[in-house]
Design a protein with these regions (language model features):
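Structural preference for beta-strand elements that scaffold enzyme active sites
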Residues: 3-7, 39-40, 46, 64-68, ...
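N-terminal binding-site loop/beta-alpha segment at the start of enzyme catalytic domains
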Residues: 1-65
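Active-site beta-loop-alpha junctions enriched in small/polar residues
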Residues: 11-13, 44-46, 70-74, 109-114, ...
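Short hydrophobic/aromatic-enriched beta-strand-loop microsegments
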Residues: 64-67, 156-164, 267-274
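Glycine/proline-rich, positively charged
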Residues: 17, 31, 77-166, 170, ...
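Conserved, mostly hydrophobic/aromatic
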Residues: 8, 33, 41, 54, ...
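Structured C-terminal cap/extension of enzyme domains
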Residues: 29, 34, 39, 153-154, ...
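Alpha-helix-loop-beta-strand connector modules within alpha/beta enzyme cores
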Residues: 51-71, 124-135
Length: 293
């Protein structure tokens, strides 16, 4: 299956208490994405009840989407230690049950620390799951030194990492290019920088740093040919990188999903001069801006 460049991230799916209303709301969002042509769905064992919601609402459409989830943390009433082999194995088995599927397309380590990656046990656990047919591919989701190690190691099929107009280490440190050279799939989280470009504040706690960077970059003045829609600018910048395979965006409602699809299909790409100017500003102004995990 060739995945769409726009994917749906499940971190923002409504989930309060796994009530029927939450399940129905999640189903409307998920089905709107599939109906609109999105075929990449990304969730995690630690995203509340989203795996169960997916199983209840779109398991019957399983052949229509590439299913990615993550593991490593102790969640869902499980016992044990984070990043233990037992936790990894239990998490994958629990995800299969929740998602109501006999296989997952991609299982990713969720922000696994560098020292744990270097030990190798969790990677071997993923490899055994792949050999057993529980997952088709294995990946790492993370940033900074751990992300580079994951790419250079050659153990993983995919990398999920943060990349956007105020988070450009994937470009400046050649991480995305290196992943491309190794024929890894690249999945981008936070591709629209939490919507901070042009805003006076951020609704997300970890978006404060993004907002600060945005303000510094914008102080250099307007960008020629900059799209009037900040969302179009940010998504256009992210998808302009030649080594970005899919960008995952969350949503609270079906209308937002449909709007995202329409924008990506009909309003992109943005002018290359805009992309190059954003590169220039980041490289000129960054002050050891590390990736936010």
């Amino acid at each position: 299956m060739e995945v769409t460049r726009l994917g749906l991230g499940l971190a923002e799916i409504p989930r309060h208490d796994d009530s029927q209303s939450d399940v129905e709301a999640a189903g409307r969002i998920l089905n709107a994405a599939l109906d609109g042509g999105i075929n990449f769905l990304d969730t995690s064992a630690c995203y509340g009840e989203t795996e169960e919601m997916m199983g209840k609402t779109v398991a019957h459409r399983r052949d229509e989407y590439f299913l990615a989830t993550k593991c490593g943390h102790v969640t869902g009433g499980a016992t044990g230690q984070a990043w233990s082999v037992e936790t990894i194995e239990q998490s994958i088995d629990r995800s299969l049950k929740r998602l109501q599927t006999d296989h997952i397309d991609l299982v990713q380590l969720h922000s696994c620390p560098l020292e744990v990656l270097e030990q190798g046990d969790v990677i071997e656990a993923l490899q055994r799951a792949r050999d057993a047919g529980k997952t088709r591919f294995i990946g790492h989701s993370g940033d900074n030194e751990a992300a580079r190690w994951a790419v250079e190691s050659g153990h993983f099929d995919t990398l999920q990492t943060s990349y956007n107009l105020v988070e450009q280490h994937g470009h400046t440190k050649n991480l995305l290019s290196l992943a491309g050279e190794k024929e890894m799939g690249t999945i981008i989280k936070r591709p629209v920088a939490n919507g901070v470009w042009g805003k006076t504040s951020s609704p997300y706690a970890y978006g404060d740093e993004y907002h600060r960077r945005s303000e510094i970059m914008r102080e250099l003045g307007p960008i020629g040919d900059e799209p009037g829609d900040p969302y179009m600018l940010t998504m256009g910048f992210t998808l302009a990188h030649p080594n970005v395979d899919v960008a995952i965006v969350g949503s609270h409602n079906p209308a937002h999903v449909r709007s995202n699809i329409e924008m990506v299909e009909n309003q992109l790409p943005i002018a290359d001069s805009v992309v190059q100017e954003i590169y220039r500003r980041f490289e000129q102004l960054e002050d050891d801006w590390r990736q936010l995990t």
